[in-house]
């Protein structure tokens, strides 16, 4: 007996309604859970309550932070959760305590660990770091400071439209994660703020950083050991210390860095442009298959630099040689101005010289004149127009 067409239509409609209901996200407003938008009342418990509800839900969840300023102490959002779709939709500002000592000895202010499928959309994170920077500048005994936003051992993370202001230490750290996308992120801190790296990536794969503007007192993006398949595109950096691979080789047994692409980036008034840096001591580390492409330098102190003799304070490494092996590094379409005469510097390991370095269509000037390139223990090729003249 044939099933009536109307019954089939009704059945399909019912299935669609059920699926739609399952897919519809549950929303928890932190204000409804006790958070106060006055910037003075501690709202940490309300945020943790929202997270507990979200993490226990089998449906997708939106944690909504309305307009206003919400004071948070250091907070840890831990997984695994029962769903893989939790979104923080932030219309307001999360504010760290004015007394930097409240969170200054915590590794992180806002920390996600063992989560999957977390999205942060919009919002401002105000780390209130200026007083701690002043403490450090005075030479007094100060806490080391907290990273503003940290992700550890987490997968499928998305961060978009987020602003991080005045972090005590690093602004954003991605550690031990896979498949992370950061888009339209803005980082802002004073050019003399200590150790305030914009985005730090280590022991992670499949990280993408797009369409972002970073102004800070340390590296705009720092790339640590164990990073692979990293893509950075359309990023403006300055002030800051540039985009740095390293420091590598701090530990004798260390994971390497490979498959990194940095393209369409602009450096303005930075200490470095494109930098690879390793400690001058033995290590199993490496950096290979690196592409730097389409970069503009505007009054940058060290536009292109490999430094394998990093030894801060001349402690723990004098008289030793870097064991980090650097190979297959390409600089393509790099142009602009250097604020120092040496615009290209390859200072590589005497034991493991840099190999397969390629310069292609590079033009860097110093005071509108020809700049200088220097090489030590570096080998490779040059193609197209290369100024300063290649020393490879």
Where are the model-predicted features located?
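Extracellular/periplasmic carbohydrate-active domains that bind, remodel
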Residues: 2-392
């Amino acid at each position: 007996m044939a099933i009536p067409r109307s019954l089939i239509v009704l059945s399909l409609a019912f299935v669609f309604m059920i699926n739609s209901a399952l897919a519809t996200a549950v929303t928890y407003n932190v204000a409804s859970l006790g958070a106060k938008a006055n910037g003075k009342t501690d709202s940490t418990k309300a945020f943790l309550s929202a997270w507990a509800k979200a993490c226990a839900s089998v449906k997708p969840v939106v944690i909504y932070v309305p307009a206003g300023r919400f004071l948070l102490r250091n907070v840890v959002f831990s997984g695994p959760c029962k769903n893989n779709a939790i979104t923080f939709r932030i219309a307001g500002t999360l504010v760290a305590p004015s007394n930097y000592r409240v969170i200054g000895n915590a590794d992180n202010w806002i920390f996600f660990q063992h989560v999957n499928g977390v999205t942060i959309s919009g919002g401002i994170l105000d780390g209130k770091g200026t007083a701690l920077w002043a403490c450090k500048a005075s030479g007094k005994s100060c806490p080391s400071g907290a990273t503003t936003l940290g992700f550890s051992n987490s997968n499928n993370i998305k961060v978009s439209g987020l602003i991080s202001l005045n972090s005590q230490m690093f602004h954003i750290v991605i550690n031990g994660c896979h498949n992370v996308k950061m888009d339209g992120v803005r980082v802002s801190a004073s050019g003399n703020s200590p150790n305030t790296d914009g985005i730090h990536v280590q022991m992670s794969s499949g990280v993408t950083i797009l369409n972002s503007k970073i102004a800070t007192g340390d590296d705009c993006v720092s790339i640590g050991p164990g990073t692979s398949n990293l893509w950075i595109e359309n990023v403006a950096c300055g002030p800051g210390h540039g985009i740095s691979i390293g420091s590598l080789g701090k530990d004798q047994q260390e994971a390497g860095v490979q498959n990194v692409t940095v393209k369409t980036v602009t450096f303005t008034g930075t200490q470095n442009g494109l930098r690879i840096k390793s400690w001058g001591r033995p290590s199993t580390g490496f950096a290979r298959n690196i592409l730097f492409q389409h970069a503009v330098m505007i009054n940058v102190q060290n536009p292109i630099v490999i430094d394998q003799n990093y030894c801060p304070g001349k402690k723990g490494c004098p008289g030793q040689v870097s064991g980090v092996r650097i190979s297959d590094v390409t600089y393509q379409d790099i142009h602009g101005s250097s604020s120092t005469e040496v615009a290209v510097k390859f200072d590589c390991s005497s034991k493991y010289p840099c190999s397969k370095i390629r310069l292609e269509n590079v033009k860097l000037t110093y005071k509108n004149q020809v700049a200088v390139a220097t090489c030590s223990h570096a080998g490779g090729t040059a193609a197209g127009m290369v100024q300063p003249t290649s020393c490879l």
